[in-house]
Amino acid sequence: NNKDMALKIKDECVNNGVEAITVQADVSSDDDCKNLVQETINAFGKVDILVNNAGTTKFADHSKLDKLNDEDFINIYKVNVIGPYQMIRAVEPIMKENGFGSVVNISSIAGKTGIGSSIAYAASKGALNTMTLSLAKALGPEIRVNTVCPGFIGTGWFENRFGKETFDRIKKDQENITPLNKAGTPDDIADSAVFFCLEGAEHITGETLISDAGMHLN
């Protein structure tokens, strides 16, 4: 939902010789999902790869159940679960027609371990992981569906949410407690997503790849 950042990244792509477009969409809206796919087809003629990277959450102490209500769950699931489903449904016809498609869902270790910003968030990511399995079975052989589960990722959003001091402390903690002594970066997750789209991953579907410097082992 950061228009300025999207335009900045588009400019970086264009400056590096890559064709790029920006389309604003709310993935919880089925009409927006369909329009996003159609705009992509209009620009490039096809869709080979879909990365479902939109997400939302609410921060709530797991031990305080009254901090979440039904609306919180619905709002989180609309973006984190229904959104990816609607995007995949929108690209299915063109991918099937072309005989090829790779879908990468960006989930979280919250969906594997139960940790995270809230129980609703962790539950939504667990649902996304399970949906990956179901869709991998349903959409083959033309379309492969896989998932990347990041741990802590140092992003501007995270820093803006907590402030630089808290952000730096959390990042340092990650560097100290993870087996690889590393805090994750957006590039780490991008590399994992790209892997699933390369020729070397053509034999892989329904897989969940944890990319968290070993954080889930603690």
Q: Whereabouts are the PLM-identified features?
A:
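Residue(s) in the substrate-gating loop at a strand-loop-helix junction
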Residues: 108
